[in-house]
Amino acid sequence: MILVIAEKPSVAQTIAAVLGAKEKKDGFLTGSGYIVSWCVGHLVGLSEAAAYGEQYKKWSYDSLPILPQEWKYTVASDKEKQFKTLKELMHRADVSEVVNACDAGREGELIFRFVYEVAGCRKPMRRLWISSMEEAAIKEGFSRLKNGEEYDALFASALCRAKADWLIGINTTRLFSVLYNHTLNVGRVQTPTLKMLVDRDAAITTFKKEKYYHVRLALSGAEAASERISDKAKADAFKTTCEASRAVCTSLVKEKKTAATPKLFDLTSLQREANRLFGYTAKQTLDLAQALYEKRLLTYPRTDSAFLTDDMGDTAAGIIKLLCGKFPFMAGKDFTPELGKVLNSKKVSDHHAIIPTMELAKTDLAALPESERNILTLAGARLLMATAAPHTFEAVTAVFECAGQSFTAKGKTILCEGWKEIDRKYRAALKSKPETDDADSDTEKTLPPFTEGQTFENPAAKVTEHDTTPPNPHNEASLLSAMERAGSEDTDPDAERKGLGTPATRAAVIEKLVKGGFVERKSKQLLPTKDGINLVCVLPDTLTSPQLTAEWENNLTQIAKGKADPAAFMEGIEDMARELVKTYPFLSDDKAQMFKPEREALGSCPRCGSPVYEGKKNYYCSNKECIFTMWKNDRFFEERKVAFSPKIAAALLQSGKVNVKKLYSPKTGKTYDGTIVLADTGGKYVNYRVELPKKK
């Protein structure tokens, strides 16, 4: 029997159906010589720090740095049953080999290898490496299974990534949390990402708006604009001068230009466009693309390539023909794809670009959930655009001289709409129309037929007022672009992988920052919180700079190719952890209070006037020399079965009394309405009394 282990139950079921393993068992399927089971994501992971000794259970500076000599692994508590199933299957006498069918990438390799190692399996291992869940792709993948050893370098890279994240994450999080008395989650990728958000926020906050002006001449129905003028009075005076002068066309330049077709989607560009068009978060887009992949409708989503392999021409042509028949916005269009633009095996590493599959022929698009349909249609539309003709146009720039200054008018004439016709029709078919970026809109009109030397006497003129604009806050689309480019200017130009994180991890990084309270979403915007801004301010450049992380990613890529030493990489990580702990032994008291939560005072102390705050068990005066305290479990309130709430405490502090309904009488066993009065006499304990409403 051959044991096949997939990453998820849904993928296992698809593979089992192709292999003929139809008999369902508890935690696996079997039949036709195969057993197909699954991991349910990360079944096994690196153990928490506490597993390495009692001294690490409590967070303290003295226990840092934590540098495991022998790494320990832990089975996820909620997945122990499935791990036990896999371990038993691996050790079954009739199982001769194990096939790793987890996702074809760094994390998929790690998920499988952790289970394989912790289960103590030593049976031969082979690797299934596919980019599509279509039946034909699965069959082809099983016909060319590779020896597991060929992916040892990929596993080494994945293991280094996991250990490096553990070492930097655990040590820096504990270090700065202890120093600042507040849980501060620090991460190799998330902290430089947060820094980019904080930098953008600072640029917006410090931006000073300035007005500027243009003088515009009306020339045969076209407008020619002057250079910027900073002074309104000068602009008005110049306008008057122009209206009494002659404008002469001194230059007329016509250029044929081409807007190249967009590339196919890799994961990051798909996430950016889905955010721009539909407002989906990076995580939502990844989840939707993964769901479509598991339904065999989309190719593997966690890719960083925007090309197909050279041998995929016929496949792409078949899918394009299918899309032309499926998409209403392609109805009646005679479309001949230019496939050569999207085929380039040299630019495909693990997986090719994201495109729909032929499974679409059997699928009713209308039956899909709207969000999945949006992603599938978006990927299909991009395949059509990428193989369409270029968009060509003639750009005309006319320069005029008037009153000693230059004026410019620009226009364009479309020669071939090309791929932009598909883009326009696709957008028009969308249920909700996205906002159009300035870069995408063709605002330039066709200019009149000007000629050099042409003159205009006393042209009409006007002054237009404008404001300089601050940078826009980051949204998911712009942040993903920034993460992708981060560190590029400081990184070796020959580096194969640059930027923060990988296409597969960037969505999770953004979500972690939001959940940690360092970033908040406002509509489509991603804004740093006060804690986020403070965290970036207190951390050293080594943790906030994207350069280091970008270098790490490139090193991990080289390890995956067998071109770099994993041991040397880990030694550098450990040295960094040691250096950080040595550099930050203590803080001044004012800095240590930086992350102390801002408390809202309930009122003023009736004895000294200082703010009164809520504690776990009481309401206390903030003046350490004052002993005024109202206890939540005061017998006065407990006897009357009244919860001493912050609302009651605030009313007592403000007016000395509060009306309360349904006070319990221990004497009569009944309830009544009354007024609780703060009867403070200045002693150790605060006294209260009840006043009953006066009878009319």
Can you describe what each PLM-predicted range is?
Residues 71-74, 102, 122-126, 147-154, ...:
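Short, polar/flexible loop-turn hinges at active-site or ligand-entry regions and domain interfaces
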Residues 1, 101-104, 181-183, 254-263, ...:
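Conserved short loop/turn motifs at secondary-structure junctions
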Residues 135-217, 254-258:
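C-terminal or mid-to-C-terminal helical accessory/interaction module adjacent to the motor/catalytic core
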Residues 2-3, 25, 79, 90, ...:
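Basic, low-complexity terminal or inter-domain segments flanking catalytic cores
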Residues 1-162, 166, 427, 470:
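Intrinsically disordered, low-complexity regulatory segments
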Residues 9-16, 33-36, 40, 76-87, ...:
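Amphipathic alpha-helical transducer elements in NTP-driven molecular machines
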Residues 232-265, 271:
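Metal- or metallocofactor-binding catalytic centers and their adjacent structured scaffolds
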